[in-house]
Curated annotation (Swiss-Prot):
Position of sequence motif 'HIGH' region: 40-51
The family this protein is said to belong to: Belongs to the class-I aminoacyl-tRNA synthetase family.
Protein name listed in UniProt: Leucine--tRNA ligase
Positions of ATP binding: K695
Length: 918
C-alpha cells in the first residue's frame, strides 16, 4: 500500500474535528498542564514557514503530556486589534473589520493543515466584544484602584477616599505621580473636580500630561519597543517627542514585585537579565537643591552621594517641570530653539547618542552642603521620568557628565586621590576621597555611609530606592482598538457601569488617523454614554494580550473574566513559547496585569507563565539583483565589482539555483519592464544572503506549498530537524526530501508487497533494545526541548528495525506512539491499522525498560601492578575463571609479564583485572 500523505492527513484532521479529539474540560482525576503559544497578529500575507516553529514545538510537548496522562489545555486565538491589522486595512483600502476577519480565516486554514492539537472551542479574538468586554473590565478595576506600598498590593480607590476624609495624606506610603501633602480638612473642603484630580494622582489607570513618542504618519503614540533608530518599526516612519494628555498604567508601582518575581519562574537567564535591566533598580539618595534667589526647591536622585563635593553643574531634562522656573528671559530664545531640536529625537536615541548637546538656562542652584552656586543646564541625555528628571553632574566620575563638561568648558573636580582624568572620567567606585570636606581620607565605601548619615541628620534629603521602569502609556490615537470604558462629565473622567460593558467600537466610514492627533472616534455619531461624551482614544495593541491566557481558561463565561473554579484548576501557564522580542513589552505587561489581578483575588498565582521558551528564528535565503546606479541596467553577480551598483532584493520565486528568470522579473515590477541585463556565461546570476524571513525582503516561503508537496508530518519533522529550537537557522526546502523518504521507510516497515504485515510474536532482544533506546532518547529530548535530535533518533530506529525486518505488534505500537507527537497523522493511521479503535492520543506513552538497554559485552581494563595497560571485551555473562584464563593467554599480557608468574589476580566484575607480580 502506497503512503498517500494527502489522503491520510485530510482523513485524520476531519476525524479530530468531528470527534472533538482536542476538546478539554476540567478533570480533577488528572493533573493539569497548560501549554500556550504567543498568539499571532493575523496579517494579510498569512503564515510563512518561520511562524509555525514555536507552534510545532508546543504541539509536540502538548501531545506528549497528554500521552503521559495529563489533562492538557492547548488553546489558540488571534491578537487582532492594533497597528498591524489597521495598517494592512489602510494599505488595501478596506475596513479593518473586513480584512481582519479574512486574515483570521486564512490563518485558520493554514494552521489546520499543519495538524495542531488546539482546542478551537476556546478560540479568542481580541477584537470580539465578548472578549474585550473583559479587557475593559480590567481597566475599570485599575481605574478604581490605588497601590499601597506598605501592603505591597492594590487597594480599592473608595478605601483611599475614606482615608483622605479621616486623616488626609499624612503617614500614607502610596504609589503616585507626585507627592501631595493634604490634611483631612483640606480634602473635605475640595470640590468634586479637585477631589477627582487628587485621586487621579493615585489611580493605577490614570490620565497625565506626558511626553510621548508621536508618529505623525501613523497618527498615534508609540511605545519605546515599537520604535527603532528614531523610526516606527511598523512602516518605518519618523517619530518625534510631543507632550500629550494620555491614559497611563502605573506599572512602576509593581517594579519591586516584578523584579523579585523573576527568581520564581523558569525563564532563560538572558530574558531575565533583559527584564532586570528594563526595571532598573538602583539604590541612592534624593537630595534637596534650591534655586538661587528663588523660593523654589527641587529634588535630585543620585546613586553616588559620596561625590556631592564634585558637583560643578546641574542638568535638567528638556521636559522637566522646573524648566519654566529656571529659564531667565534673555535665555528663552536659545532654550526654545534647543527644545525644538530635541523633540525630533526619541528617548532611545537620546540615551544612546554620544553627541553632546545642551543649553544654559541662566539660573543657578545652591549646593546643599557648601552653599556654592552651581549653573543649571538643559540637555537631552537626561530623561524627565527617570529619577526626578534632573542630575547633579560630577564630571570627574561620570563619563556623560565628563563629555558635557569638556564640551562646554565646565569645571571638573577629582574626588579620588592619585587619579588621571585628563582624558576620561574615573568611574570606578574605589579609592581614597579628596577635595571632599569631611569625607577626605575615607575610602569610597566609608564615604558613602558617612554622607548618607549626614544627609539624613541634616534633613538634606532621604535614602531612596529608584527604578528605571516607567509607567505604560495606554492611549492610542487610532481607530482599531478597544474603546475605553470612560466618559466625561464636566470634564471629569468616570468609569462606565460594569453592567453596561462592553462599550463597543462604533462603525465609522473614515478610520484613518490624523497627523494632528485628533482620534478617529471623534468622527463617530452619538459617541456618548448616558448623554456624556466617551473617551476618543483607544487602547494599545498590548491591551488585549495582557491577560488573554486567563480567558482561555473560561472563554464562554459571560459573568466574569475567569471563574475561581476554572482558575484554581488551570492556574497559570506551565509552558509558554514565543519570541524574545517581547521581553520588555508583552511579557512585562502580562506579569503586571497578572499581579494586579492577584491583588484583587481574581487569580490564584502571582506569575502568569511558569516556564518560558524563546524559539529561534527560521531565516530566509534572500536573492539580490544589482542595478548600476542611475540606470535601469542590471549586472550579474560575478561582474558587479566592475560597476557602481545598488543591490535590490528580488522575489525568490523568480530565481532557481541563484539564476534569475529575466522575463518573470520584467513582469514582476513595471519599473523593470524595459530593463537591460549584463550576463555572465549567458545567465543572470543573483547574489544571496541569509536574513530574517520577511515579505519586504521577498524571501518568504509559504507552509501551504510545503505541506501540499510533502505533507504536514514531513513539514513538522523538518522544522524540528533544522536545529535546536532556541537557535536561529536558515530554511532550505531541498532538505525536506530526506524527511519525506524517512516517512516512506516508516510506512514500508508495516507492509510487505502492499499487504499489512504485523505479527504477535515475541520481539527479539535487538528489537526491544532498539525501541527502548528510542523511548528513552525521545522522552529526554522532549522534556528538554531538544526536538532536532529526536528526529535523528527516529531515523536510526527505523533503519535498525528495517534491517531486523521487524513486524512485531508490540514494537510497532510503541514506535507509532513515540512518533505521534511529532507526526500525528501518519501515527494515527498506523495506530488504527494495528487494530486500535480510539485515537492514539488516548493511549499511554511507553516507559523505557533499562534492562533492554544493557550491553551484551563489557569492557575490562587490564592492569599490571596497578597500571592500566589495555582493554579487553568480554561477554557480559562470562565467569571470573574464564576472564582470568583469557587474560593470561592474551599476547598483550605475555608482553607485560615477561615470563613472570603472577602472585595474585584481582578481578572487579565488569570493570578491572589487576595482575600482581614481582
Amino acid at each position: 500500500m502506497k503512503y498517500d500523505f494527502d489522503a491520510i492527513e485530510k482523513k485524520w484532521q476531519k476525524y479530530w474535528k468531528e470527534n472533538r479529539t482536542y476538546q478539554v474540560n476540567i478533570d480533577r482525576n488528572k493533573p493539569k498542564y497548560y501549554v500556550l503559544d504567543m498568539f499571532p497578529y493575523p496579517s494579510g500575507v498569512g503564515l510563512h514557514v518561520g511562524h509555525p516553529l514555536g507552534y510545532i514545538a508546543s504541539d509536540i510537548y502538548a501531545r506528549y503530556k497528554r500521552l503521559k496522562g495529563f489533562n492538557v489545555l492547548h488553546p489558540m486565538g488571534y491578537d487582532a486589534y492594533g497597528l498591524p491589522a489597521e495598517q494592512y486595512a489602510i494599505q488595501t483600502g478596506q475596513h479593518p473589520s473586513i480584512t481582519t476577519k479574512e486574515n483570521i480565516n486564512r490563518y485558520r486554514k493554514q494552521l489546520d493543515k499543519i495538524g495542531f492539537c488546539f482546542d478551537w472551542d476556546r478560540e479568542i479574538r481580541t477584537c470580539d466584544p465578548k472578549y474585550y468586554q473583559w479587557t475593559q473590565w480590567v481597566f475599570i478595576q485599575m481605574f478604581n484602584s490605588y497601590y499601597c506600598k506598605e501592603a505591597q498590593r492594590a487597594r480599592p480607590i473608595t478605601e483611599l477616599v475614606k482615608i483622605l476624609e479621616n486623616q488626609g495624606t499624612g503617614g500614607l506610603h502610596l504609589a503616585c505621580t507626585k507627592e501631595i501633602h493634604l490634611t483631612a480638612n483640606e480634602w473635605q473642603m475640595k470640590d468634586e473636580k479637585s477631589k477627582q484630580a487628587i485621586l487621579m494622582n493615585y489611580r493605577i489607570a490614570y490620565l497625565s500630561d506626558i511626553v510621548v513618542n508621536w508618529c505623525p504618519a501613523l497618527g498615534t503614540v508609540l511605545a519605546n519597543d515599537e520604535i527603532s533608530g528614531g523610526i516606527s518599526i511598523r512602516g518605518g516612519y519618523t517619530v518625534e517627542q510631543r507632550k500629550m494628555r494620555q491614559w497611563c498604567l502605573r506599572i512602576s508601582a509593581y517594579a519591586k514585585r516584578l523584579l523579585e518575581g523573576l527568581d520564581k519562574i523558569e525563564w532563560t537567564d538572558s530574558l531575565k537579565k533583559m527584564q532586570r535591566n528594563w526595571i532598573g533598580r538602583s539604590e541612592g539618595v534624593e537630595l534637596r537643591f534650591k534655586i538661587k534667589d528663588e523660593n523654589i526647591e527641587f529634588m535630585i536622585f543620585t546613586t553616588r552621594p559620596e561625590t556631592i563635593f564634585g558637583v560643578t553643574f546641574i542638568v535638567i531634562a528638556p521636559e522637566s517641570e522646573w524648566l519654566t522656573q529656571t529659564i531667565i528671559s534673555k535665555k528663552k530664545d536659545s532654550v526654545d530653539s534647543y527644545l525644538n531640536l530635541v523633540k525630533r529625537r526619541t528617548e532611545r536615541e537620546r540615551i544612546s547618542n554620544r553627541k553632546v548637546t545642551g543649553v544654559f538656562t541662566g539660573s543657578y542652584a545652591v549646593h546643599p552642603i557648601s552653599g556654592e552656586t552651581i549653573p543649571i543646564w538643559i540637555s537631552d541625555y537626561i530623561l524627565a521620568d527617570y529619577g526626578t528628571g534632573a542630575v547633579m553632574a560630577v564630571p570627574a566620575h561620570d563619563s556623560r557628565d565628563y563629555a558635557f563638561a569638556k564640551h562646554f568648558d565646565l569645571p571638573i573636580i577629582p574626588l579620588i586621590e592619585d587619579i588621571d582624568i585628563s582624558k576620561e572620567s574615573f568611574d570606578i567606585k574605589e579609592g581614597i576621597m579628596t577635595n571632599s570636606d569631611f569625607l577626605n581620607g575615607l575610602s569610597v565605601k566609608q564615604a558613602i555611609q558617612k554622607v548618607k548619615e549626614y544627609i539624613k541628620d541634616e534633613n538634606l534629603g532621604k535614602i531612596k530606592v529608584n527604578y528605571r521602569l516607567r509607567d505604560a502609556i495606554f492611549s492610542r490615537q487610532r481607530y482599531w482598538g478597544e474603546p475605553f470604558p470612560i466618559y466625561y462629565k464636566n470634564g471629569i473622567p468616570y468609569a462606565v457601569d460594569e453592567e453596561d460593558l462592553p462599550i463597543k467600537l462604533p462603525e465609522i466610514d473614515k478610520f484613518l488617523p490624523a497627523e494632528t492627533g485628533k482620534p478617529p472616534l471623534g468622527r463617530a455619531k452619538n459617541w456618548t454614554y448616558k448623554g456624556y461624551p466617551l473617551e476618543l482614544t483607544t487602547m494599545p495593541g498590548f491591551a488585549g494580550s495582557s491577560a488573554y491566557y486567563l480567558r482561555y481558561e473560561d472563554p464562554h463565561n459571560s459573568e466574569c473574566l475567569v471563574s475561581s473554579e476554572a482558575n484554581e484548576y488551570w492556574q497559570n501557564v506551565d509552558l509558554y513559547i514565543g519570541g524574545i522580542e517581547h521581553a520588555t513589552g508583552h511579557l512585562i505587561y502580562s506579569r503586571f496585569w497578572n499581579k494586579f489581578l492577584f491583588d484583587l483575588g481574581i487569580v490564584a498565582k502571582e506569575e502568569p507563565f511558569k516556564k518560558l521558551i524563546n524559539q529561534g528564528m527560521i531565516q530566509g535565503r534572500s536573492n539580490f539583483v544589482y542595478r548600476i546606479k542611475n540606470t535601469n541596467t542590471f549586472v550579474s553577480y560575478g561582474l558587479k565589482h566592475q560597476y557602481d551598483v545598488t543591490p535590490i532584493h528580488v522575489d525568490i520565486n523568480l530565481v532557481f539555483d541563484d539564476v534569475l528568470n529575466i522575463e518573470s522579473f520584467r513582469d514582476w515590477n513595471s519599473e523593470y519592464k524595459n530593463a537591460e541585463f549584463i550576463l555572465e556565461n549567458g545567465k543572470y546570476v543573483c547574489g544571496w544572503a541569509i536574513e530574517k524571513m520577511s515579505k519586504s525582503m521577498f524571501n518568504t516561503v509559504s507552509p501551504d506549498n510545503i505541506v501540499n508537496r510533502f505533507g504536514a508530518d514531513a513539514f513538522r519533522l523538518y522544522e524540528m530537524f533544522l536545529g535546536p529550537l532556541e537557535q536561529s537557522k536558515p530554511w532550505d526546502t531541498k532538505g525536506i526530501d530526506g524527511i519525506a523518504r524517512f516517512l516512506k521507510r516508516l510506512w514500508n516497515l508495516f507492509f510487505e508487497n502492499d499487504v499489512l504485515k504485523v505479527s504477535n510474536s515475541l520481539p527479539l532482544d535487538k528489537e526491544l533494545k532498539s525501541i527502548h533506546k528510542l523511548i528513552k532518547k525521545v522522552s529526554w529530548d522532549i522534556e528538554n526541548f531538544s526536538f532536532n535530535t529526536s528526529v535523528a533518533a527516529f531515523m536510526i530506529c527505523i533503519n535498525e528495525l528495517t534491517l531486523l525486518k521487524c513486524s512485531k505488534h508490540s514494537i510497532l505500537s510503541d514506535l507509532v506512539i513515540v512518533l505521534a507527537p511529532f507526526a500525528p497523522h501518519i501515527a494515527e493511521e498506523l495506530w488504527h491499522l494495528l487494530g486500535n479503535e480510539a485515537t492514539i492520543f488516548d493511549s499511554q506513552f511507553p516507559k523505557c525498560n533499562e534492562e533492554y538497554l544493557k550491553e551484551e559485552n563489557v569492557k575490562y581494563t587490564v592492569s599490571f601492578n596497578g597500571k592500566a595497560r589495555f582493554i579487553l571485551n568480554f561477554p557480559k555473562k562470562i565467569s571470573e575463571e574464564n576472564v582470568k584464563d583469557t587474560v593470561l593467554k592474551c599476547e598483550s599480557s605475555k608482553k607485560w609479564l615477561k615470563n613472570k608468574i603472577p602472585k595474585k589476580i584481582i578481578i572487579i566484575p565488569n570493570k578491572i583485572v589487576n595482575i600482581v607480580f614481582d
